[in-house]
């Protein structure tokens, strides 16, 4: 069974934690990780880009001049694409980029990502993160003790003092276990769990 050292916020080792092999030492399926990241980024797209076609441009639909007898090419209306200020031909219109991934594949992707992080020694486990007050300075000190400047912190429950202390630190993000996602796991230099959040993630991904 996989094991990791457990530290306190003073950077001292206080014990060990056994990790579920089914979650943290599973087969790494990189294609699933790639697919999950691609879907997550696609679903962030607003898809609201739009231009006016000839039907949407304001103005008359009257012919600018008669069909015959002028010596010029025939024209339908001044809203046509060839006129300045006319509608755009075949321009972009709003669309949805949403993609989906079934629950089984999504869980497998999370297990693969966590296993990859474990194999690459990018996981840190703390016994708890209890901040008595909101203090960015104190939390920066905790991170510096582990030589970190880019980290994802995963908690098992809402931790208001921690969230407020971390929100103004560049390249640091605090997530509850319910919000754990592939993109953030892959983005940060290191992922910091508490013991309770490890157990909660294991419970969610083993079931």
UniProtKB/Swiss-Prot annotation:
Domain of life: Bacteria
Biological process, per Gene Ontology: translation
Assigned keywords, A-Z: Ribonucleoprotein, Ribosomal protein, RNA-binding, rRNA-binding
Example of a GO MF term: structural constituent of ribosome
InterPro entries: Ribosomal_uL4, Ribosomal_uL4-like, Ribosomal_uL4_dom_sf
Pfam families xrefs: Ribosomal_L4
Residue span of region Disordered: 59-78
Assigned GO CC terms: ribonucleoprotein complex; ribosome
Complex and partners: Part of the 50S ribosomal subunit.
NCBIfam families on file: rplD_bact
Family: Belongs to the universal ribosomal protein uL4 family.
Record-linked PANTHER family: 50S RIBOSOMAL PROTEIN L4, LARGE RIBOSOMAL SUBUNIT PROTEIN UL4M
Function noted in UniProt: One of the primary rRNA binding proteins, this protein initially binds near the 5'-end of the 23S rRNA. It is important during the early stages of 50S assembly. It makes multiple contacts with different domains of the 23S rRNA in the assembled 50S subunit and ribosome. Forms part of the polypeptide exit tunnel.
Protein name: Large ribosomal subunit protein uL4
């Amino acid at each position: 069974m996989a094991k990791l050292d457990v530290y306190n916020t003073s950077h001292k080792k206080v014990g060990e934690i056994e990790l579920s092999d089914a979650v943290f030492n599973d087969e790494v399926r990189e294609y699933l990780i790639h697919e999950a990241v691609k879907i997550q980024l696609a679903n962030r797209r607003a898809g609201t880009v739009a231009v006016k076609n000839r039907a949407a441009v304001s103005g008359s639909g009257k012919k600018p001049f008669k069909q015959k007898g002028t010596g010029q090419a025939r024209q339908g209306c001044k809203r046509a694409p060839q006129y300045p200020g006319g509608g755009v031909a075949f321009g972009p219109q709003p669309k949805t980029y949403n993609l989906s991934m079934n629950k089984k594949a999504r869980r497998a992707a999370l297990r693969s990502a966590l296993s990859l992080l474990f194999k690459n020694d990018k996981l840190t486990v703390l016994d708890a993160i209890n901040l008595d007050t909101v203090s960015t300075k104190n939390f920066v000190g905790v991170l510096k003790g582990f030589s970190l400047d880019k980290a994802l912190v995963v908690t098992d429950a809402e931790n208001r003092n921690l969230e407020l202390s971390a929100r103004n630190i560049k390249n640091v993000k605090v997530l509850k276990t319910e919000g754990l996602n592939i993109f953030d796991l892959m983005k940060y230099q290191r992922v910091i769990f508490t013991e309770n959040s490890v157990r909660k993630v294991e419970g969610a991904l083993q079931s």
